[in-house]
Amino acid sequence: RFKPGDDASCNNLYRSTQPRVIGLTESFVKHFDAATVAKFRWMKTEAKNDADKVNPWHLLDSTDRADDDSIPVVIDMNTAMYSLKPAANVGTNLELTYDDRVVRFHVVGLLENSVLQGSLLISEANFERLFPEVSGYRYFLIQSPPGKSKQVAEALESRLSDQGFDAVPASQLLEQLFAVQNT
């Protein structure tokens, strides 16, 4: 799921007050339980048990703060430090306004630079609760077989052109982010 908002990546020179939000599916989270898959790199998390240390994405489902209605969120470190207003760190609560409604997020993890830079990452269940008017899926991470990325992208763009599908290689997206970040 995808809620449009400010680009909070390093491509935006201004501080973001309403960053885009991505709701991560349960299958995305469980994918990283496997020891053999490539994983995102984490700068810092609130992980306390072994399962959450192995796969910090499970922190998005945490309910440890029963007295608090905040939504667990993961953000990349650069967005958290430089693009959000106010800046955030693990353990920080952020209050942001979406659709004239204040939403409180609790930062449970900070990612290193990744293709997810500039977005607030929450569980799909929390996304559906916060933004019930947003239906369908608009943001995809696709793992293609080695050497087949171009063919997979062409097939998806061809078959989903009426829906406006546009595949961008992760390497290209990261190059764009690093070009700005390293200036």
Predicted regions and their residues:
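Alpha-helical transmembrane segments of bacterial inner-membrane membrane proteins
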Residues: 1-183
